[in-house]
């Protein structure tokens, strides 16, 4: 195990945070691991893992976020709404394929339904699995392109009336991405860069693999490497790659860290505020709360907002405590498994750090 921690030595609390992260890292077994914390703009980064460090420091590698890409999609939608370019209640089919005949339930699906997993759509299209299963551990998404995602949506038969039940859906968020691209006449990757990445200064965040040796390499549970993820037509749901330092920048914008510069564009400030606001309760006695794009839990130190993600060989966790200046980003390069401790460890850092 190799460890590095970085934080200004003169800042009160920094050594304590470094010790907390070093202790937490012992619970995670992965070739590469990064645990990063921002406290009121002061960053502490712990790197480690069972593999030998490469020529690029672990905290400067871009990691696959998987489903932790969805907060980026949510912020993009919120900003487009703030700009008046779309509305949450716009019907997706009307924007994506005006006049195309669809099932009445599909006609009722709005942009809000797609983002909040209340569209009634399944997690993935039914015809996704036959082409994915033969290559489930290597490239399940690459053979299912954008036009196929759109066609699957237009011919869908939702399981439930839109807006009545919560069911996590990569399919739905992917459709949201294609719908926003159609509504604005701008490819998703360009739209995300213009509206989210560039304004927040996320220069090391992208949706495609970067130059050689700049991306982290994922691993199966047995330690063998896996190829970089190709998300096919599911880009909006899981294609973002970012360095842990960029992840902290993204989270610091959400947490409202006092020393961070206020967004120059009021629509960005409005979007950041909107995605922090609880909008949905579900489950037994409405115990589970969600914002537009974040899971929302209570903690001893106030509410926490978070999202985790996993790909074929990597994992990521993003979380923050609004109004407290605390943000946590974590990445690991081993495929998730039943006894995996990565998410629980990162969640513990977020919820138990004083």
What residues fall within each predicted segment?
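Short, glycine/proline-biased beta-turn/loop segments that scaffold the active-site neighborhood
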Residues: 87-102, 200
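Catalytic tyrosine of NAD(P)H-dependent dehydrogenase/reductases that use a Tyr as the general acid/base
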Residues: 63-66, 166-168
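Short, gly/Ser/Thr-rich active-site loops of penicillin-recognizing serine hydrolases
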Residues: 280-285, 299-300, 332-354
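Actinobacteria-biased recognition of intrinsically disordered, low-complexity terminal regions
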Residues: 1-15, 352-354
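Active-site SXXK
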Residues: 18-21, 41, 64-92, 176-181, ...
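Short, well-ordered beta-strand elements
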Residues: 44-46, 307, 315-334
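Short, conserved catalytic-motif segment at the N-terminal edge
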Residues: 11-65, 87, 209-210
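Short, surface-exposed loop or secondary-structure junction motifs
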Residues: 42-45, 103-311
């Amino acid at each position: 195990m190799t460890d590095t921690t970085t934080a200004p030595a003169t800042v009160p609390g920094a050594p304590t945070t470094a010790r907390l992260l070093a202790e937490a890292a012992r619970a995670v077994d992965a070739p590469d691991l990064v645990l990063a914390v921002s406290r009121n703009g002061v960053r502490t980064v712990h790197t480690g893992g069972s593999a030998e460090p490469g020529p690029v420091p672990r905290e400067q590698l871009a990691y696959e976020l998987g489903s932790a890409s969805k907060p980026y999609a949510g912020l993009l939608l919120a900003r487009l709404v703030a700009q008046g370019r779309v509305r949450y209640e716009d019907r997706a089919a009307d924007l994506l394929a005006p006049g195309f005949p669809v099932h009445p339930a599909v006609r009722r699906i709005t942009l809000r339904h797609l983002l909040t997993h209340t569209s009634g759509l399944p997690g993935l299209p039914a015809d996704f699995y036959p082409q994915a299963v033969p290559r489930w551990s290597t490239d399940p998404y690459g053979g299912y392109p954008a036009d196929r995602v759109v066609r699957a949506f237009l011919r869908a038969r939702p399981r439930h009336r839109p807006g009545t039940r919560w069911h996590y859906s990569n399919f739905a968020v992917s459709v949201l991405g294609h719908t926003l691209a159609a509504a604005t006449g701008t490819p998703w990757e360009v739209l995300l860069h213009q509206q989210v990445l560039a304004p927040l200064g996320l220069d090391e965040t992208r949706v495609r693999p970067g130059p050689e040796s700049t991306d982290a390499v994922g691993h199966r549970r047995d330690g063998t490497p896996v190829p970089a993820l190709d998300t096919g037509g599911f880009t909006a749901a899981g294609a973002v790659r970012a360095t842990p330092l960029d992840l902290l920048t993204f989270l610091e914008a959400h947490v409202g860290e006092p020393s961070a510069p206020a967004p120059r564009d009021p629509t960005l400030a409005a979007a950041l505020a909107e995605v922090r606001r609880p909008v949905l309760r579900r489950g037994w006695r409405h115990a589970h709360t969600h914002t537009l794009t974040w899971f929302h839990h209570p903690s001893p130190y106030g509410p926490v907002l978070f999202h985790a993600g996993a790909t074929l060989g990597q994992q990521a966790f993003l979380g923050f405590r609004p109004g407290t200046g605390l943000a946590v980003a974590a990445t690991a390069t081993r495929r998730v498994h039943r006894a995996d401790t990565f998410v629980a460890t990162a969640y513990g850092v977020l919820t138990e750090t004083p």
